[in-house]
Amino acid sequence: MTIKLAIDCMGGDHGVGVTIPAAIHFLAVHEDVEMLLVGQPDAIAAQLKRLHATANPRVHVVPASEVVSMDDPVEVALRKKKDSSMRVAINQLKEGAAQACVSAGNTGALMAVSRYVLKTLDGIDRPAIATAIPNEKGAGTTVLDLGANADCEPEHLLQFAQMASAMVSVVEQKPRPTVGLLNIGEEVIKGNEVVKQAGELLRASDLNFFGNVEGNDIFKGTTDIVVCDGFVGNVALKSTEGLAKMIGEMLRQEFSRSWFTKLLAVVALPVLTRFKRRVDHRRYNGAALLGLRGLVIKSHGSADAYAFEWAIKRAYDAAANGVIARIAQAFESHHDAAGAAPVSTSAPAADAA
């Protein structure tokens, strides 16, 4: 089966200089993929010429005259820039021309446009942002929400867990992934009322609920999935990224102190290389906007070509494993079993940067 991926070529801090090289390199190692490169034709053509990919039959240019900048308010992206590369790329999903969309654009705009164009799946009140964070076990812990919903009701946290369980079960081939609820302690009496009530809902559900987990459990890999509201999740994600950069910089400084430490660095290079690979945040780039009637993957805005290619891989894996259909099926099963309609609430604009 051929998988078609729509790439927002103009999004992010670096635009076509990153997105197109990543897409072309991914094509070279995946023969079952076609790329829909969405953006300004002249800019795309210049990159394709530089990469000697102009005549590639699996590359299709989809014109879009506008660009959503990283500073554009949601209202501008949603109401004024209707021919932006972001909007046109998402339209490819709605029209069935692509199985997934990848964008490094403004998170708030991407969530708002995606929700407006694609709508949410039945039974889901609010979409959530989910990604994997490195852990000791090497597989990565899937954490959500990472910034789409700063304030949540208990039912929303349950839905986040249901969506993530459906995704992880097919992408990572884990039939019953474990779910942890992020809290300030493992005891059921701890946490605010929302977290306590969410814990009760999770314990009563058919999910493989482990119980409350703390922040350090994300990195231990205690559970396959960790659920929290978007405010807590975004702080955890940004703290993780900052810590990884700090450790890398401190190692560089220490190994540069003298000729002896520089010699030690050479001796330790194989170990340091393996360590860097395990904690390299670029390998975990690509967050899924779960809960929509289409597969949208958000790349970090500052991603380089290597990191953006990992976001493309996330989209490819999710599309190949039918994640959207699996989530829809899961919610149909959950609500058939519950015999109750989902809570209806309005969703705020995404808060993540």
Swiss-Prot record:
Annotated GO MF terms: phosphate:acyl-[acyl carrier protein] acyltransferase activity
Record carries keyword Amino-acid biosynthesis: no
InterPro entries referenced in this protein's UniProt entry, alphabetically: FA_synthesis, Phospholipid_synth_PlsX-like
Group of enzyme by EC: transferase
Pathway membership: Lipid metabolism; phospholipid metabolism
A Pfam family reported for this protein in Swiss-Prot or TrEMBL: FA_synthesis
CC terms in the record's Gene Ontology section: cytoplasm
Catalytic function, reaction form: a fatty acyl-[ACP] + phosphate = an acyl phosphate + holo-[ACP]
Keyword tags: Cytoplasm, Lipid biosynthesis, Lipid metabolism, Phospholipid biosynthesis, Phospholipid metabolism, Transferase
Compartment annotation: Cytoplasm
Annotated EC: 2.3.1.274
GO BP field: fatty acid biosynthetic process; phospholipid biosynthetic process
Complex formation: Homodimer. Probably interacts with PlsY.
Family statement drawn from the similarity comment of this UniProt entry: Belongs to the PlsX family.
Protein's job: Catalyzes the reversible formation of acyl-phosphate (acyl-PO(4)) from acyl-[acyl-carrier-protein] (acyl-ACP). This enzyme utilizes acyl-ACP as fatty acyl donor, but not acyl-CoA.
Protein's name according to its UniProt entry: Phosphate acyltransferase
